[in-house]
From Swiss-Prot:
<comment type="pathway">
    <text>Purine metabolism; IMP biosynthesis via de novo pathway; 5-formamido-1-(5-phospho-D-ribosyl)imidazole-4-carboxamide from 5-amino-1-(5-phospho-D-ribosyl)imidazole-4-carboxamide (10-formyl THF route): step 1/1.</text>
</comment>
<dbReference type="GO" id="GO:0003937">
    <property type="term" value="F:IMP cyclohydrolase activity"/>
</dbReference>
<dbReference type="InterPro" id="IPR002695">
    <property type="entry name" value="PurH-like"/>
</dbReference>
<comment type="pathway">
    <text>Purine metabolism; IMP biosynthesis via de novo pathway; IMP from 5-formamido-1-(5-phospho-D-ribosyl)imidazole-4-carboxamide: step 1/1.</text>
</comment>
<keyword id="KW-0378">Hydrolase</keyword>
<dbReference type="InterPro" id="IPR036914">
    <property type="entry name" value="MGS-like_dom_sf"/>
</dbReference>
<dbReference type="Pfam" id="PF01808">
    <property type="entry name" value="AICARFT_IMPCHas"/>
</dbReference>
<dbReference type="Pfam" id="PF02142">
    <property type="entry name" value="MGS"/>
</dbReference>
<dbReference type="GO" id="GO:0005829">
    <property type="term" value="C:cytosol"/>
</dbReference>
<comment type="similarity">
    <text>Belongs to the PurH family.</text>
</comment>
<dbReference type="InterPro" id="IPR024051">
    <property type="entry name" value="AICAR_Tfase_dup_dom_sf"/>
</dbReference>
<keyword id="KW-0658">Purine biosynthesis</keyword>
<keyword id="KW-0808">Transferase</keyword>
<dbReference type="GO" id="GO:0004643">
    <property type="term" value="F:phosphoribosylaminoimidazolecarboxamide formyltransferase activity"/>
</dbReference>
<protein>
    <recommendedName>
        <fullName>Bifunctional purine biosynthesis protein PurH</fullName>
        <ecNumber>2.1.2.3</ecNumber>
        <ecNumber>3.5.4.10</ecNumber>
    </recommendedName>
</protein>
<dbReference type="GO" id="GO:0006189">
    <property type="term" value="P:'de novo' IMP biosynthetic process"/>
</dbReference>
<dbReference type="InterPro" id="IPR016193">
    <property type="entry name" value="Cytidine_deaminase-like"/>
</dbReference>
Length: 515
């Protein structure tokens, strides 16, 4: 019995050559629309879909393959006489191979000029139906959705006259992943169109970006997936100019770095980061000076760390960075001279270029945190704050310099692991106390790191002080200004302690826990 293939593709790369090989093996080819035109023009003999169904394409192509003579040919089980008899009774020819890819829905909704009607018209109905029918009957039918699989299919047909069951099963699994992802994109688009903020079903789809050697530790298997709708300001979108492949930990740290730098747009700023905690942040009038401040903040912890800069890296800055062992440098650009300096004898240094003009758009993405048996979903912590909304709660008002330092410290504190404390002046971080299980311990760590540099320093806390002992420790160190959210039932104790020692303290009203 002559084998039959049904081919209907929007991506025509390689399809002519594929069909030509099938005809050499004696296969009949059924085709539709533009695919049939392309194959006919290439000299491939095809059968029109309406010659099979006896029914014309209609409704602007919306109805063409949704027909029993197509789906019966795909779904008929070859091992059941009743199925074969039904096919014979209704003159349904069996179809042994389906090659289909779908209307470009994703590409359509990414167009800047897309309209709702255009998006809807690019929802494929017949294609997924054929793919799913063929995949369900993979015991007998080969289904191909990816041109990358053409050589495997042709090779097996050439060698043994048909594909192996293992190949058909693998391709069926690929199809179900593909159609599920396609439907997830459509569901996400419609969910956003109707403004559903808490849908009862969460459908998200990600594409494999990079298989990883291992995860956080060598005993953990891992891979890197990126959002199927690409985000322009993301590590997945960064262009790697030098160095080894990014590791699992590199990607997590780099993501933390580009989140931090979003909050520092107005002035040249450099952030040094280690284990997802900032170890040094510097801001100045030039990127070179900002680097100096970030490095000076903690020249020990920066070793083996990640650095992100919000201005193009120039030669002078590169000269200062080059002697330091860094894992990754991220910037919106590099001068040719700077790149030559940074890559000299540094073949493993990962240098990433990332455009910063899409930072605001990246802030609307949800954050996902896996828990055993579930997934937590939240907005990013990107609330817009203004000092005019802050409240001075002490008798002493901040000086102009203290206000500037507190604004800088408050932005920086957002990214320190809770319980998080950070000490800064108006140019650089001086001490970081991250991730302690009690807040006074974080205060002590930050003070110890900042000692001998506390003149004019301020302290920021990501959450309120539960007890006044924190303020007492701060005052004893010589720090004169505190910024914190407030909100404790014992706030007045902290205020009284600040007044006792002549400190100024500001409440922001916004907490910034980070776990």
């Amino acid at each position: 019995m002559t084998k039959r293939a049904l081919i209907s593709v929007s991506d025509k790369n390689g399809i002519v050559e594929f069909a030509q090989e099938l005809t050499k093996f004696g296969w009949e080819i059924i085709s539709t629309g533009g695919t049939k035109v392309a194959l006919d023009q290439a000299g491939v003999t095809t059968i029109a879909i309406d010659d099979v169904t006896g029914f014309p394409e209609m409704m602007d192509g919306r109805v063409k393959t949704l027909h029993p003579k197509i789906h019966g040919g795909l779904l008929a089980r070859r091992d059941l006489d009743s199925h074969l008899q039904a096919a014979n009774d209704h003159e349904i020819g069996l179809i042994d191979l389906v090659v289909v890819n779908l209307y470009p829905f994703k590409e359509t909704i990414l167009r800047p000029d897309v309209t709702y009607d255009l998006a809807v018209e690019n929802i494929d109905i017949g294609g997924p139906s054929m793919l799913r029918s063929a995949a369900k009957n993979h015991a007998s039918v080969t289904v191909v959705v990816d041109p990358a699989d053409y050589p495997t299919v042709l090779g097996e047909i050439a060698e043994q006259g048909e594909t192996s069951y293992a190949t058909r099963q693998r391709l069926a699994a690929k199809v179900f992943r593909h159609t599920a992802a396609y439907d997830a994109l459509i569901a996400d688009y419609f969910t956003k169109q109707v403004g559903e903020d808490k849908p009862e079903k969460l459908t998200i789809t990600y594409d494999l970006n990079q298989p990883m050697r291992y995860g956080e530790n060598p005993q953990q298997n891992a891979d890197f997936y990126q959002n199927a709708l690409p985000t322009a300001y993301s590590i997945a979108a960064a262009k790697q100019l030098n160095g080894k492949e990014l590791s699992f930990n590199n990607i997590r740290d780099a993501d933390a770095a580009i989140r931090i730098i979003r909050d520092f747009k107005d002035r040249p700023t450099v952030v040094a980061l280690k284990h997802m905690n900032p170890c040094g942040i510097g801001q100045a009038e030039t990127i070179e000076q900002a680097w100096d401040y970030a490095y000076e903040a903690d020249p020990v912890s920066i070793f083996g760390g990640i650095v992100v800069l919000n201005r193009e890296v120039d030669a002078a800055t590169a000269e200062k960075m080059h002697p330091i062992f860094l894992e990754i440098i991220i910037a919106p650009g590099y001068s040719a001279e700077a790149l030559a300096i940074l890559t000299n004898k540094k073949k493993n240094l990962r240098i990433l270029e990332l455009a910063f003009d899409a930072q605001d758009a990246s802030e609307v993405e949800k954050e996902f945190t896996g828990v055993v048996g579930g997934l937590l979903v939240q907005d990013q912590d990107v609330v817009v704050e203004s000092p005019v909304d802050w409240q001075v709660v002490t008798e002493r008002q901040p000086s102009e310099q203290e206000w500037a330092a507190m604004e800088f410290a408050w932005k920086s504190s957002k990214y320190v692991k809770s319980n998080g404390i950070i000490i800064t002046n108006d140019k650089m971080t001086l001490g970081v106390g991250p991730g302690q299980t009690n807040r006074v311990a974080s205060v002590r760590i930050a003070i110890e790191q900042a000692k001998d540099r506390l003149e004019g320093a301020v302290l920021a806390s990501d959450a309120f002080f539960p007890f006044a002992d924190n303020v007492e420790e701060i005052a004893a160190a010589g720090i004169k200004a505190i910024i914190q959210p407030g909100g404790s039932v014992r706030d007045q104790d902290s205020i009284d302690m600040a007044n006792k020692y002549g400190l100024t303290m500001v409440f922001t009203g916004v907490r910034h826990f980070r776990h």
